[in-house]
Amino acid sequence: GTAYGILELSRMIGVSPWEWWADSPVEKKQSFKLKEGFKTLQYPSVARRGIFINDEDWGLTPWSYLTHEPSDTKGQIGPKTHARIFELLLRLRANTFWPAMHTCSVAFYLTPGNKETADKYGIFIGTAHCEPMMRNTNAEWKTAGTGKYDYVNNRENVLRFWEERVKELASSDNIYTLGIRGVHDGKMQGANTLQEQK
C-alpha cells in the first residue's frame, strides 16, 4: 500500500511508469501542490495483476546476462534485472510476476537473489502451466529430480520434488499451479487416456 501511495504521487507529478525502461523524460516542475486535506482511496478490481515473461530468448535473456547484469552463466536473469521489472510492475499498479521459463534462461529460483528481490518488492510469483508447485521442471528435474518425471509411476519422487520447493517458499507470496503435465509443453507421462489423466 505504501509503495502504491508514493508511486501515485510520482504519477501526479508527471513521472511515467516507463521512466527507466522507455527512457521517458520526466517533466521538470518548479513546484507541486496538493490541496489541503487531499485524499485518494483506490482499490483494484482484480486482486492479482501482472505479467508473464514468455519467449525471453530473443530479448530479455541476452540483454540481462550480457549487458545489464553481466554474468558468466548463460541465460541468467538475475536480481538486478528483476528489481527493475518489479519496480515497473509497482509503478503500473501490478503485483504479480510469472518468470521466464524456457530452456534458454536459468530457472528463476536457481538464481541467487531472485526470490529475495521478489519478497523485498512484495511481488507474488506464479508459474506457468507446465511448472506445477513452483518448480520449473524443464530446468530443475534434471538436477533435483529422481527417475522419470512421471507422477503415475514415480509418484513419491515427484511429490518430494514439489515438496522441497513448497517448503523453501513457505514465507513468500506465491500463486501455485496445481495441474500437472509433462516437462515443458509435453503431455503427462504415465497417463495415456483421459481417464488415466484424471
Q: What are these language model-derived features?
A:
Residues 1-152, 170, 174:
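Feature activates predominantly on carbohydrate-active enzymes
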Residues 148-153, 189, 193:
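Polar low-complexity intrinsically disordered regions enriched in Ser/Thr and small residues
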Residues 85, 114, 161, 165, ...:
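A general structural detector for well-ordered alpha-helical segments in enzyme core domains, enriched
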Residues 152-163:
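Glycine-rich anion/phosphate-binding loops
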Residues 159, 166-172:
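Residue patterns forming the tRNA-binding/recognition surfaces of aminoacyl-tRNA synthetases
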